[in-house]
């Protein structure tokens, strides 16, 4: 992985006490929302929970849904949303999500289970890309692709 990239060291996905789904992502080093800025026309960075529903497998199909965070307009906070993947088109925003940064190394996504259609379980992967990077060596995944985690909700 490229120096200065977002290096994922720990991921936890499950249900919060308030009933929402929660993904907590910890990086190897401290980072800030400004690290997701795309400067001078470069693309912004993001941290995304990739979700596969039903029998879809991460090794053979694109994710069904993305829950992504990126830098907010004030450049100091994070914003997030749930997006549904569409064949041959850009993802469609389907629900709100929240993103917080409780520590210097960790960010947390929260969203309603109904945003995914209330599945009994799903497979997931996390990907993180620092702002301004178009290269694959800037992308980190957890678990390491093509592996995935699994969450049972019922």
Predicted stretch roles:
Residues 1-77, 131-135:
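Surface-exposed, glycine/proline- and aromatic-rich loop segments on solvent-exposed faces
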Residues 7-12, 22-26, 106-110, 121, ...:
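Ser/Thr- (and often Asn-) enriched beta-sheet segments in non-cytosolic proteins
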Residues 18-20, 44-48, 97, 104-108, ...:
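Extracellular structured ligand-interaction cores
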Residues 23, 74-89, 153-154:
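A broadly tuned preference for mixed-charge, low-complexity surface segments
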Residues 79-119:
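Acidic, glycine-rich flexible loop segments
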């Amino acid at each position: 992985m490229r120096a200065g990239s977002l290096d994922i060291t720990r991921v936890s996905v499950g249900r919060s006490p308030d009933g929402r789904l929660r993904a907590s992502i910890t990086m190897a080093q401290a980072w800030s929302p400004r690290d997701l800025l795309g400067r001078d026309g470069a693309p912004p960075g993001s941290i995304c929970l990739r979700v596969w529903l039903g029998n879809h497998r991460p090794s053979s199909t694109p994710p069904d849904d993305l829950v992504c965070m990126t830098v907010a307009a004030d450049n100091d906070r994070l914003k997030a949303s749930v997006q549904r993947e569409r064949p041959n088109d850009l993802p469609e925003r389907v629900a709100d999500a929240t993103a917080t940064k409780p520590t210097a190394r960790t960010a947390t996504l929260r969203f309603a289970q109904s945003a995914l259609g209330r599945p009994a379980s799903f497979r997931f992967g996390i990907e993180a890309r620092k702002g301004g990077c178009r290269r694959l060596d800037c992308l980190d995944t957890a678990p390491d692709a093509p592996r995935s985690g699994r969450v049972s909700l019922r």
